[in-house]
Amino acid sequence: DEELSEELAEKLMLTSTIAGMAIAQTGTSIPHALSYDVTYHNGVAHGKACGIFLAAYLRVYAEQKPEDVEEILTLLGFKTLDDFASYLTEILGTVSLTQKEVTFYIDRMMENTSKLATCPFELTREDIEKIYRESIVVE
């Protein structure tokens, strides 16, 4: 609730610009794609919407490429996915959706073949459902 200082605002704009340039060069992955509907239709801040899907996405990823997830967790300073998931819940809180919304958003994601193609392995509807189940509180 504090007022944003000019210095902090400048740093925020700089980091946002650098992040935008990185995304423009590398693209984004599944948590980012899953965040679109949650942000647009439910008003959840974009960063939070991306973050709530990270741990569950990494769980699905670990089923295919456990060594990659192990390296990610090590680089982030976490020993386990559970530790990482707990940390994300602590800083982001939870997001609640209705089952109707979840089903609609999953349907839309499955139609988004360009975003599904960013995943380094084939992502099934069941995988997306699992990610939602572990990331969202269904009302």
Predicted regions and their residues:
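Active-site segments that bind and position negatively charged phosphate/pyrophosphate groups
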Residues: 1-86
